[in-house]
């Protein structure tokens, strides 16, 4: 759990406030009036079945998807304001995707410096120093000259985290960061996320890793059908869910032998 009263100076944490968020693709309404608050320094995990709107919600926060209604505030920015400075807002929001999204033609260090020099206008030497600090943090201090295809999936995802951290974000978004990994590399990525949570980084995480959510999250939100079905402290939502739909989902996830196949 994070200690929200003791956020290090290195992390100027941003909160998130979402009100009445709606998103449709044609006639298919994916998000149906979502209300959500993430306090500075808080870790919130979004869980639920595929197609419930979790990833769409995450992508709406930094406007990778354009909402159809509602408001989103991140730190001092109203991201849904037509006049918002998107570049400045996105500098403060780091995002880690399922599929790493590293530049294959750039080295590990270059992947971590290119946005620093182009967006933050840092000198190359400073950008490299920041990149090295974050690569060290994720356990890849000696991998700077390698290319993505020379790394395992877990190592690539750790580079993606270092790249995001190199932009000095005040909020980190994780969209199922372990779903594309081999089982033996999942733990190394989750360990980095645990360290960020412990250090006070604000995190909004879409995950199917229930043990991670129960251990690290301050709150868990269960979504289904584009709405929030249940939310609360992680130990309550995962350990003692109150809503039948949440109970059924967790029973299937935590005990796959429960699932019955229709004949």
Region roles according to the model:
Residues 235-263:
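C-terminal boundary and immediately downstream tail of ABC-type ATPase nucleotide-binding domains
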Residues 11-234:
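ABC family nucleotide-binding domain
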């Amino acid at each position: 759990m994070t200690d929200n009263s003791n956020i290090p100076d290195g992390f100027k944490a941003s909160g998130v406030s979402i009100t009445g968020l709606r998103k449709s693709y044609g006639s298919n309404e994916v998000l149906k009036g979502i209300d959500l608050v993430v306090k500075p320094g808080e870790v919130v995990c979004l869980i639920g079945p595929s197609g419930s709107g979790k990833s769409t919600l995450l992508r709406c926060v930094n406007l990778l998807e354009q909402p159809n209604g509602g408001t989103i505030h991140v730190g001092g920015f109203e991201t849904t304001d037509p006049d918002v400075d998107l570049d400045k807002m996105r500098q403060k929001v780091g995002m880690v995707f399922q599929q790493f999204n590293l530049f294959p033609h750039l080295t590990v260090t270059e992947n971590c410096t290119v946005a620093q020099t182009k967006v933050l206008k840092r000198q190359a030497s400073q950008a490299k120093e920041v990149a090295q600090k974050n690569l060290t943090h994720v356990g890849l201090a000696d991998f700077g000259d390698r290319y993505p295809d020379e790394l395992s999936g877990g190592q690539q995802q750790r580079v993606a985290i270092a790249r995001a951290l190199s932009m000095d974000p005040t909020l980190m978004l994780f969209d199922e960061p372990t779903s594309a990994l081999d089982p033996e590399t999942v733990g190394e990525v989750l360990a980095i996320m645990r360290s960020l949570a412990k250090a006070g980084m604000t995190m909004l995480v879409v995950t199917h890793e229930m043990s991670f959510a129960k251990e690290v999250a301050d709150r868990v939100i269960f979504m289904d059908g584009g709405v929030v079905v249940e939310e609360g402290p992680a130990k309550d939502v995962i350990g003692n869910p109150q809503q039948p739909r949440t109970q059924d989902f967790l029973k299937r996830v935590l005990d796959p032998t429960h699932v019955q196949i229709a004949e």
